């Protein structure tokens, strides 16, 4: 079992080489094309719930990285309550992916989970250098978060069956771009071994001559 501390950071394990980021899964789908996206998202929600369950068993911290709905005063309870109690489209999806008490939650004001948030500090605290990204939308907030993670030299796993966009074509294109440009592993979640992933080393970064070198830790 992972060791947790007594301080304010203790919602996640103190040492975890890999973390699971769930991006914009607490979602009301009350926007243009939201109904279309929801239809594609519901089966993906079941996959996300499955990977979260696997992560918990493997001692991998789960971090909800969620839009603040344009309200800086928003918090986790308000957002979840809105999605469950206000008759919004996203209620059946959110019920699949509800956070647990010991999950971490980061509110973001823009597309990337790293922009103006505490996400990088959380990941630094637990020592995660590899990230599993899942959520909505593959060609938008998942892509922007993946890009910023790559710029910070994180190793990326973005299971193709745990990401959804407004159309299947847009989703496939975004995944291929993340695989090609950001060196992401887009293997379906059923083919990934979270226990082995906990021991994955840092991403290789190209030096000025283009050759790979291992990034130093600490």
Task: Describe every region a protein language model picked out.
Residues 22, 26, 65, 159:
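Generic enzyme active-site microenvironment
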């Amino acid at each position: 079992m992972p060791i947790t501390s007594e301080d304010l950071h203790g919602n996640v394990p103190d040492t975890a080489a890999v973390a699971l980021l769930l991006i914009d899964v607490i979602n009301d789908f009350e926007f243009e094309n939201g109904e279309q996206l929801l239809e594609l998202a519901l089966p993906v929600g079941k996959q996300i719930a499955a990977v979260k369950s696997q992560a918990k068993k493997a001692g991998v911290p789960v971090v909800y990285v969620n839009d603040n709905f344009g309200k800086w005063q928003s918090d986790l309870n308000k957002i979840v309550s809105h999605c469950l109690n206000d008759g919004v489209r996203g209620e059946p999806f959110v019920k699949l992916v509800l956070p647990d008490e010991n999950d971490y939650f980061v509110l973001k004001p823009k597309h990337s989970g790293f922009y103006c948030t505490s996400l990088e500090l959380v990941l630094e605290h637990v020592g995660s250098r590899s990230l599993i990204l899942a959520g909505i939308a593959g060609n938008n907030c998942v892509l922007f978060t993946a890009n910023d993670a790559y710029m910070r030299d994180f190793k990326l796993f973005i299971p193709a069956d745990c990401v959804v966009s407004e159309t299947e074509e847009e989703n496939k294109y975004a995944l291929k771009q993340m695989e090609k440009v950001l060196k992401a592993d887009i293997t379906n979640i059923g083919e990934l071994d979270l226990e082995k992933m906990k021991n994955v080393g840092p991403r290789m970064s190209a030096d000025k001559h283009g050759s790979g070198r291992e990034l130093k830790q600490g």
